[in-house]
Amino acid sequence: MFSENISLRNAYRQYGTEVLRELFLDWEDVPSDDSFVRSLHQVQKALWESLPINVSEDHPMLLPSTQGTFRSLYAAQAVQAKADIRRVDKVAFGVVGDAHWSYPHLQLCERWNALAEKMGFSAVFVPITITFSQTHLNLEAVAVSLERTESERLRFTDVLRLEASKCDTLLLPPLSLSQSWVHELEKALDKPVCEPLCSRETTAGVRLERAIASTFQKMGIPVFNTEQCKLRWSGGNIDKLEFLDSARQLRTATADQYVLTTGRFSSRGFNIIGKRWGASASGLPLFIERGKIWQTAFPPVEGYQKLGLALTADFRPKFSSEETANNLRATGSCIGGVDIGKRKLGLGLLALLGRECAKKMAKP
């Protein structure tokens, strides 16, 4: 067992180093091995503060997936790890859904129950149908409204309280709820709350975006949430930024320096062909390493590709004409998991490089 744990730790370290080497490939000053280790801890800390991770070093967790299966993983978000059916005995999971959501909770219950019985596990999945939304919504819209509106969170808690007695643990849709609110919800309902794995992490970027925004706000830099943005040029500089806010209202921002983040952009699924790229990042240079798929070093082995904004070594967006703006920088790169069967990209890892970007901005 001891040797297995050592091998697993080495696999995680190798994985983290590979991720960082990919992210640093285009840099002029490639860090030394010692810098890699320090940078890995910084990246992990930033990621884990916004997306807490549970790691199992002895046996893999067996977690329900929205594909109607169970996946064997050594690491998962903390809220997902609570649904490990290997570590529960005769637990009834209440699978929450709403008829207006794009989430087939009834069908998932049937598949998970059939599979659990076949595999000899005692976990039971009980459908809990609530009435929360009045119109048809995808889960991303539900998650954003819950993250941003306190009244919606209170109403959601009240609705769940009416049904909580039907189960031992509530299994919500993959909403990527913040850890602090998960704790509040568990305290209010007196029940554990968890989420299933999702083949495409639809809303993790909401929380990562908030972590990036918090970093900049502490530095005294205003942060705007945009649905779409358009850059206005003047003499090699960005003169102003026009953008649609969350209410779809056109706004204008002017500043001496601009920093763009990619949390919202890279949290969504994208067609590998690239047909859906322009929707939420119009006018920005996007890239994907089409010909390169590398693999993680620990189970389950998955393919990954790098996508995001095309940047120079000093974090300037690099447009097709090799033109860059003097007063524009961008943060963030995404190592995206690839679903070869469905030809989709999911959020594998978004590295928060705001600190390094800020250092570049501070240089004369």
What role is predicted for each listed range?
Residues 260-277:
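Flavin (primarily FAD) binding-site architecture
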Residues 1-3, 8, 268-273, 325-328, ...:
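A conserved FAD-binding loop/helix module that cradles the flavin
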Residues 252-265, 328:
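Short hydrophobic core segments
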Residues 217-229:
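A conserved beta-strand/loop element that lines the FAD pocket in flavoprotein oxidoreductases
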Residues 250, 284-342:
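FAD-binding beta-loop-beta segment adjacent to the flavin cofactor pocket
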Residues 213, 230-253, 258:
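Conserved beta-strand-loop-beta-strand element in the redox core of flavoprotein oxidoreductases
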Residues 2-108, 112-113, 117-137, 158-161, ...:
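Conserved N-terminal/central alpha/beta ligand/cofactor-binding core
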Residues 117-135, 199-200, 270, 277-306:
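Central beta-strand plus flanking loop segment that forms part of the substrate or channel wall
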